[in-house]
């Protein structure tokens, strides 16, 4: 029976039981000692694929640990689950849908049927539609209501319609097409729209309304605000089609808004929002970096797809990262995972991975509706590495929690300034080294004595200088951030998330927890605005409504 119809209780599997025993034997394992005793440790725990180099040697593992984790992947029938996803089976069981974002990066000539229909011709038809639009805008042929060419593109969308495209377009700014600036409008907070409107001119701005339903509250409100602003700036209803296009599956709503049918790019229900940057949702990416670079992004992701499908689990980058996450979350009680990019242009990768991981694996029931038998997804957090060193790295080094970390760093900078990049790279490596090695009490005391401190001062200060070490991390190195390598990197994390969902038996492709707050928000809005006098279901919410109504003017 398919894994998603009958998920395993993973804790009952022999490999899980063996890992539990193995964890006890690893209680006093020291990474520092492991490196000292095994000169081959680095080569044993590194691999490369799709332009990415992974060093996972700074983890609380031995070859036995890896073997047991790989056995666990085998016992949950991971290979069958991967095939089921790529074949278009209904792996999103709660919504009765496939999860085929991987189809968006498959080459021309591939065939893939959904409900008996080959979807690949449609995928490439939309890519061609994107190519035509991007070419017209970049060549100055798409003009606004005053016949001036488009200079600014504003993507109106939230969640997956925003985080992935923003990450990629900013990460690849070195590849940006000159003459077109891309902006993102996501938050329903009017201040965001106000600040954006100060940077653009209506006559040369194209708005992309990205919403599968064309009914997402934040997106629709911002689209309406943009429409009103456009009209107030001198635009007309007749020329609205020059300034608004859509990515949506609700053509009727988009047309009613004023968007022409030929300017609506389709979405499919087998692509989830957080996996959608490869689709027409990636239109702002293509407008930012050009269609040829967008296709390179797809190609890099496809290369990682092939690696994921074919590499043995012990040499499979996303599988190994997923298994390490399970190892720490379920056997070492780690509750969070830090993403630390040492690259300014990758500053938004943590936000994208937060949604990708936490919306996918923030689940407490298995695919069949039964409760999970173990903890699932961790909190994903972090930020630009060098800045983080002067903020939260203190907790990573000396805090009481174990927080595994991923360091991501390029070898080559697009903007070399003196020896800045050498220092940046050195800081990345030294942080992972310090997490692993730490500083013993004896080392702290010796260091203080060398500074000429009295023995009383040494004994007083030494405890504060001790760094426990033995804190796990992975280091991902790329030669430079290119479309192809970035595509592979993002796809790798997508696959990592899926693997963990298979192990836990959860559905990585729904997000029912998001819906409840949305529905309640409508009722709260009615009470705030006087649409109903019926009190809220709890005194706290009603009290806050009353506080707002008593003070708000506007």
Curated annotation (Swiss-Prot):
Pathway(s) per entry: Carbohydrate biosynthesis; gluconeogenesis; Carbohydrate degradation; glycolysis; D-glyceraldehyde 3-phosphate and glycerone phosphate from D-glucose: step 2/4
Keyword tags: Cytoplasm, Gluconeogenesis, Glycolysis, Isomerase
Reactions this protein catalyses: alpha-D-glucose 6-phosphate = beta-D-fructose 6-phosphate
Coiled-coil ranges per UniProt: none
Active site feature: 359 (proton donor), 390, 518
GO molecular function, one term: monosaccharide binding
CDD domains per UniProt: SIS_PGI_1, SIS_PGI_2
InterPro entries: G6P_Isomerase, G6P_Isomerase_C, Phosphoglucose_isomerase_CS, SIS_dom_sf, SIS_PGI_1, SIS_PGI_2
Protein's cellular compartments: Cytoplasm
Top-level lineage group: Bacteria
Gene Ontology BP term (one): gluconeogenesis
Enzyme class: isomerase
GO annotations of cellular component type: cytosol
SUPFAM superfamilies: SIS domain
EC identifiers of the protein: 5.3.1.9
Pfam (any one): PGI
Family affiliation: Belongs to the GPI family.
Function: Catalyzes the reversible isomerization of glucose-6-phosphate to fructose-6-phosphate.
Protein name listed in UniProt: Glucose-6-phosphate isomerase
Annotated source species: Pseudomonas savastanoi pv. phaseolicola (strain 1448A / Race 6)
Gene that specifies this protein: pgi
């Amino acid at each position: 029976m398919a894994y998603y119809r009958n998920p395993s209780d993973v804790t009952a599997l022999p490999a899980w039981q063996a890992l539990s025993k193995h964890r006890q034997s690893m209680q006093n394992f020291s990474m520092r000692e492991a490196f000292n005793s095994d000169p081959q440790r680095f080569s044993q725990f590194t691999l490369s694929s799709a332009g990415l180099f992974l060093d996972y040697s700074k983890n609380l593992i031995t070859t036995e640990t890896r073997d047991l984790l790989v056995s666990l992947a085998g016992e949950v029938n991971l290979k069958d689950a991967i095939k089921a996803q790529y074949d278009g089976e209904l792996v999103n069981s709660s919504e009765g849908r496939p999860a085929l974002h991987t189809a968006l990066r498959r080459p021309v000539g591939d065939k893939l049927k959904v409900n008996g229909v080959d979807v690949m011709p449609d995928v490439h038809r939309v890519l061609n539609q994107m190519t035509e639009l991007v070419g017209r805008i970049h060549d100055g042929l798409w003009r606004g209501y005053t016949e001036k060419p488009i200079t600014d593109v504003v993507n109106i969308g939230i969640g997956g319609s925003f985080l992935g495209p923003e990450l990629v377009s900013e990460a690849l700014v070195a590849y940006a097409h000159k003459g077109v600036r891309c902006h993102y409008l996501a938050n329903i907070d009017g201040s965001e729209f106000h600040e954006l409107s100060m940077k653009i001119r209506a006559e040369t701005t194209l708005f992309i309304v990205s919403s599968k339903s064309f009914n997402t509250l934040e997106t629709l409100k911002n689209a309406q605000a943009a429409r009103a602003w456009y009209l107030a700036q001198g635009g007309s209803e007749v020329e609205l089609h020059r300034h608004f296009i859509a990515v949506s599956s609700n053509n009727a709503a988009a047309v009613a808004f004023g968007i022409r049918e030929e300017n609506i790019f389709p979405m499919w229900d087998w692509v989830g929002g957080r996996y959608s940057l490869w689709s027409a949702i990636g239109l702002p990416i293509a407008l930012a970096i050009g269609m040829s670079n967008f296709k390179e992004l797809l190609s890099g992701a496809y290369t990682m797809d092939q690696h994921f499908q074919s590499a043995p689990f012990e040499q499979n980058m996303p599988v190994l990262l997923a298994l390490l996450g399970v190892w720490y979350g379920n056997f070492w009680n780690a509750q969070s995972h830090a993403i630390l990019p040492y690259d300014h242009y990758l500053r938004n990768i943590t936000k994208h991975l937060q949604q990708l991981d936490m919306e996918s694996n923030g689940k407490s029931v298995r695919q069949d509706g039964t409760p999970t038998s173990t903890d699932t997804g961790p909190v994903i957090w972090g930020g630009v590495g060098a800045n983080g060193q002067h903020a939260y790295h203190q907790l990573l080094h000396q805090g009481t929690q174990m927080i595994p970390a991923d360091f991501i760093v390029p070898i080559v900078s697009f903007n070399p300034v003196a020896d800045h990049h050498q220092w940046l790279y050195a800081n990345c490596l030294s942080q992972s080294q310090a997490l692993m090695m730490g500083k013993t009490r004896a080392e702290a005391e010796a260091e203080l004595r060398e500074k000429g401190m009295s023995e009383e001062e040494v004994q007083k200060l030494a405890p504060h200088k001790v760094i426990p070490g033995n804190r796990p991390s992975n280091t991902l190195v790329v030669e430079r951030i290119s479309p192809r390598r970035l595509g592979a990197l993002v796809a790798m994390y997508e696959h990592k998330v899926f693997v963990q969902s298979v192990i836990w038996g959860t559905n990585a492709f729904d997000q029912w927890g998001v819906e409840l707050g949305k529905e309640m928000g409508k009722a709260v809005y009615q009470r705030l605005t006087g649409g109903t006098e019926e009190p809220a279901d709890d005194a706290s919410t009603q009290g806050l409504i009353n506080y707002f109504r008593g003070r708000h003017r506007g």
